[in-house]
Amino acid sequence: METGQKILVAIDDSENAIRAVEHVAKFFTPSNKITLFSVLQDTVTMFNMNHPELTPYFMAQQTYFGELEEKQKSIVEEAQKKAKKILLDAGFKEENITLKSQHKQKGIARDIIEAASGYNIIVMGRRGLSGIQEFLLGSVSDKVLHSAKDISVLIVN
C-alpha cells in the first residue's frame, strides 16, 4: 500500500473489528496515519427512554441506563486500547495513531462516513449477523460500503 495515507478504522468491541485492525497492521505500512474510530450508542435513544408512555418505575430506572452507557464507553475504550497495541506491535508509531469516539448522531454508518471526510480509506470488519437479521436490519458495513462516496472502503471478513 502507498505510504502516508489517512486510514479510518471503524471499530467496536467485536472480533470482526479486531480482525480489521490486524489486517491494517499486516498489509498497511507503519507510515500511514491511523484513526481508530468508534460510534457510541446513546442509551436513552437505544432504549426509547424519551417515550411519553414510560411507566414511573421505568423512568426511575434511568440511572441504571446511564450506568450502561458508562459501561459501553469503557468497553469501547478497552477495544481501542487493544487495537492500538496491535498497531504499535506491528511497528506503527504512537503519533500516527489517533483514538476517536463520538455518540451516535445520524446513524452509525452515516457517522462513520462523515468522520471519514479527508481520509483515503475506511477499513472495518464485517458484522456477523445471520442472513435474516442482515436482510431485516442491514449491516453497518453494508451501509457504509454502499453509501460512501469518493472514498475506498475495505471490509475485512
What function would you assign to each model-found segment?
Residues 17-20, 108-109, 137:
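Amphipathic coiled-coil/heptad-repeat helices and related helical stalk/stem segments
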Residues 35-37, 98-102, 154:
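General small-molecule cofactor/ligand-binding pocket signal
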Residues 2-66:
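Small/aliphatic-rich secondary-structure junction motif
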Residues 114-157:
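Gly/Ser-rich helix-loop-strand patches that form or flank binding pockets
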Residues 81, 85-121:
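Structural beta-alpha unit
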Residues 70-75, 79:
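Low-complexity, serine/threonine/proline-enriched polar segments
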Residues 22, 110, 142-143:
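Active-site phosphate/pyrophosphate- and oxyanion-stabilizing loops and adjacent acidic/basic residues
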